Amino acid sequence: MEKIIVRGGKQLNGSVKMEGAKNAVLPVIAATLLASKGTSVLKNVPNLSDVFTINEVLKYLNADVSFVNDEVTVDATGEITSDAPFEYVRKMRASIVVMGPLLARTGSARVALPGGCAIGSRPVDLHLKGFEAMGAIVKIENGYIEATAEKLVGAKVYLDFPSVGATQNIMMAATLAEGTTVIENVAREPEIVDLANFLNQMGARVIGAGTEVIRIEGVKELTATEHSIIPDRIEAGTFMIAAAITGGNVLIEDAVPEHISSLIAKLEEMGVQIIEEENGIRVIGPDKLKAVDVKTMPHPGFPTDMQSQMMVIQMLSEGTSIMTETVFENRFMHVEEMRRMNADMKIEGHSVIISGPAKLQGAEVAATDLRAAAALILAGLVADGYTQVTELKYLDRGYNNFHGKLQALGADVERVDDSKIDVTNLASLF
């Protein structure tokens, strides 16, 4: 078993380049199934386990997929099958986004109920409601969602919650539907805009991505195209916090300020200096951090995917902070691990009361989900002694070479095979 070991106390300085966004690339890869002509070429693709998983799903569906360096090519011109099996979908709930493209392209889709990080229920009912509105017959049997439609017809769909996945799935299904589809109360994340741009480059007619209403005029066919994935705003935010908590000076290359404006506002409120430069965002950490309250919200509110990382900087600030989670239930599983590092945190309903500044101590902790994995490593950067983070399978779903990038900025961090180290002499690693 691998673990990441961090020796706290080093200031981070230098520059770090962001990779393509995990939350953008997965639906874009799924959308390549819609192209009945040509070969799709996707650039700036991050080297993540989730990308390999979605590629395997497409291969199973009879698409020809290759992934070399940061480029994925997909030829979906053959006879696409419509059954996405449990063995792949259980690894990653985002696999559900193949359902819309399959339904539009083949008239049917059979997809296993999804897995991934265990963050609350995250139901798929909003996805299915959209498919049904367009004329699909949907049923759930034996752990699979089955949808069939002789033809999809444009419809008006109102989402009870601005779900990112449902917005993406319904939008993709609507591209080949007959007539016009209007989706209201949609997600407005940058990843939605990136997907819409890709679909439009393929010949779709999607209007309004980034606003609360998306309108899709159905077309008869889509043609493969070339597309570069937007930079990962969550990776950028994670490194911004790493720079801030260590009192460092780091340029986050390719970070897009408009994509993380809520995070920038909160960090500036805490006393962190943020400078927008031509090729990214520079973050300069202060001597003291001011306490702030944060509430996660759908975009353009504070992103739930930055919640656990933000709690690290909150527990280092002077005074009492509150983190309130409104997007997902059960997303405080990492709190118990942070307490092992001497964090003063108390869960009250959907909020965590955080008293600071904490004097963090190194400990052996286990990642409970993708973003918690990164947050525990961040905490290790400022803890006294050695922090050992296990369950790296979560980290690898969303961060490529995270420890290597931190090393390049000056952190004492190593990724090691647990069976090959002497835990009584961790100093020998550095």
UniProtKB/Swiss-Prot annotation:
Metabolic or biological pathway, per its Swiss-Prot or TrEMBL entry: Cell wall biogenesis; peptidoglycan biosynthesis
Enzyme class per UniProt = transferase
EC annotation from Swiss-Prot or TrEMBL: 2.5.1.7
Where 2-(S-cysteinyl)pyruvic acid O-phosphothioketal occurs, the residues are C117
Specify which residues bind UDP-N-acetyl-alpha-D-glucosamine according to the UniProt entry for this protein. Answer: R93, R122, P123, V124, D125, L126, D305, V327
Residues given in the record as phosphoenolpyruvate binding sites: K22, N23
The Gene Ontology biological process terms listed for this entry are: cell division; cell wall organization; peptidoglycan biosynthetic process; regulation of cell shape; UDP-N-acetylgalactosamine biosynthetic process
Q: Which HAMAP family is this protein grouped with?
A: MurA
What does the similarity note say? Belongs to the EPSP synthase family. MurA subfamily.
Stated name of the protein:
UDP-N-acetylglucosamine 1-carboxyvinyltransferase 1
Gene name tied to this protein: murA1
